[in-house]
Amino acid sequence: MKVIKFGGSSLASGIQLNKVFQLVAEDPDRKIVVVSAPGKRFKDDTKVTDLLIDCAAKALLGEDTSELFESVIARYAGIALDTGMSDEIINQIRADLQATISSDKSDPDKFLDRMKASGEDNNAKLIAAYFKFKGLNANYINPKDAGLLVTDEHASAQVLPESYDRLFALREREGIIVFPGFFGYTKDGEISTFSRSGSDITGAIVANGAQAELYENFTDVDAVYAVNPAIVKNPKKVLELTYREMRELSYAGFSVFHDEALIPAFHAGIPVHIKNTNNPDSCGTRVVHERENNNGPVVGIASDDGFCSIYISKYLMNREIGFGRKVLQILEDAGLNYEHMPSGIDDLTIIIRENQFGEDTEQTIMSRLKEELNADQVIMQHGISLIMVVGETMRHNVGITSRASKALSDAKVNIEMINQGSSEVSIMFGVKEEQENTAVRALYNEFFSEVFV
């Protein structure tokens, strides 16, 4: 049995939905279909999820939502019209969305989650109706009825372990199951969403619970590429990745697959196959425990901007018990997550995403670090990009860090920081944002000019 997930671009129009139908109908093993909300039909289009977020914001302010409401309905109606379906399903979606907009707003986070989740939920209902219209035995199932329980962390929910046993019952259902992605239910019966693009997570959770043999993730690219095609033209396709490699690359900027979605698949040992809805015959990329193709030490290079660094220096820091704990406590008090923390005997650097800082947060953090740690220096640097060089087999190859550093030096890129974990799956380089693309191209040319991945 396979669990198959379709992203928003694969479900953005009636033409796309018919491609999805063909893919499901041609393979009887594709029993559970996890769906996103309708995505972009063209470059400057607006995703349904974004329309719903804007609609929710207006509703919370008590403003008129009618225009945005109709824009959302029009997206579903356009799909129904393109596929020849009746207005019955659209009337159902209209009533559902109206009820959601009119629901309790005393807790804005819960209200926003209900609004966002309606995008996937109503699309699942529409797709199940379309499959039936085309003659398939297909049924929509609500995550609550399926037993998908999550934590009460709105916009960052985590699956509860008991969900997996409950979801196993999906194997016994007849026909095709259409399952909305992106959200689950708390034990109190409230909707709680995963982080953005969380339908990937739903697919992996359902695949784990149903003990699927394969989790297929259909998107709008032929494969995972060794580097961002917007930075390097015609990059090499990656035919096979390990879970750890994909996790590192997804975290560091690869948008093809949500990094959190790998965890349920990894725990169950379920291979993930990333494929293109618009070109299903393409080989795609498989994510597995161990990859067979080891022709190169580096499998991919990913980059992301929007980071800052806090450098803390104090003589004899290494002898001071609890110094690191005090640093992390100050961050925790401010509600900040840190990404990396490379250190020496007398200094350490904290890497943080800049979008976490409010108007006064930076000043408060800097003051506390200086005063409470009695540090010699505390310096914040903005505009940092992180570049991850990733490959499980790097640990078996001497000189990878040296080659990478030389490639950056030859390209006149200054390395602001470098970090490598003990697992040696990845090497992190910090560079100025304006040098990010130059750095990525230099590293790609160093490791992929003669390599087939």
Model-assigned labels for residue ranges:
Residues 271-283, 305:
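Active-site C-terminal subdomain of aminotransferase-like
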Residues 37-39, 183-184, 278, 316, ...:
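Active-site-proximal loop/turn and secondary-structure-junction residues that shape catalytic pockets
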Residues 29, 136, 270, 336, ...:
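Short phosphate-binding/catalytic loops that engage adenosine nucleotides
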Residues 146-147, 222-223, 280, 346, ...:
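Positions that flank functional sites
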Residues 283-453:
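A conserved regulatory-domain signal marking ACT and ACT-like small-molecule sensing domains
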Residues 1-258, 262, 430-432, 451:
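Nucleotide/pyrophosphate-binding catalytic subdomain
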Residues 214-218, 272-274, 339:
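Short hydrophobic alpha-helical runs that function as membrane-insertion/retention elements
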